Amino acid sequence: MKRIVRTAGLSIAAVSLMAGATACGSGGSGGSGGSDDSGTGGGAGFDPIAALRTAEKSTDGADSAKVESTTTMGSVMSMTADGVLAWGDGLTGNLIITYTGGTMADTMRQMGSTSMEARYLPDAYYAKMGDTFAEQSGGKHWIKYAYDDLETLGGGSGAYLKDQMQNTTPNQSVKLLLASGDVRKVGEETVRGQETTHYSGRVDVADLAEKNSSLSRSQLDDLKKTLDQAGVTTETVDIWVDDQDLLVKKVEKGETTAGAYSQTAYYSDYGTDVSVEEPPAADTADFTELVKQ
């Protein structure tokens, strides 16, 4: 039972690690994007590439924002994330992650709670687990994932996750569309009371990993193998940009071997203050030590 609880906690914490990367940047699979807002097509002569370049620079320069996201992946999980993230000097921030469905939520209930706190620092990620986990892990409530360890233990996929965690920003979604060469203006739409412009495009995940990361050839080959095994090929990214050229909504949809993947994220209060503290060392267990037990 002790080992089961530790293993479950590590798995859930790892999924939550990716929640930060995807909420702030991009990471999914293939399919078709969409929106619950209505819109009209772009006018003749409009250059979506130029508009997106402006949005990419404006969003990158804003440095921080409040983030709300919902993510689903087949029958494995559905979850929400709510908090603040900053990206001026690596990804930092706090998110409250709640598992609302799927096998992950069932596992969390067995551990006493369906919610957890996630803290992101430039060199590591921390997940606060429940008391049940602490009882089986020497009384420690937090799990630490150092990004350098992810690269060492996770091969190409770990190296890519490390790269994304240290370099990701909300404007990564805009960069994806720019790099894909397949982007169109869908129309003008209202999102949460704001007038926005909606853009959509299809991206090749493995190809963009090569264009937008610092991975070596062997790491890229390893990542591509992992993506292929997961059924990840292409995905559709939809973004909504306001009149300040800031990203206010992102939708990614696709398919994996685990089922349909979808994430919707909303961004607001750009420039908000973000303060993150490293959890107490005495209450923190390193995941590299936990996996050995």
Model-predicted regions and their roles:
Residues 1-13:
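Bacterial N-terminal signal peptides that target proteins for export
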Residues 19-23:
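C-terminal motif of bacterial Sec signal peptides marking the signal peptidase cleavage site
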Residues 3-6, 25-293:
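Subset-of-secretome marker
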Residues 15-17:
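Extended, amphipathic alpha-helical scaffolds
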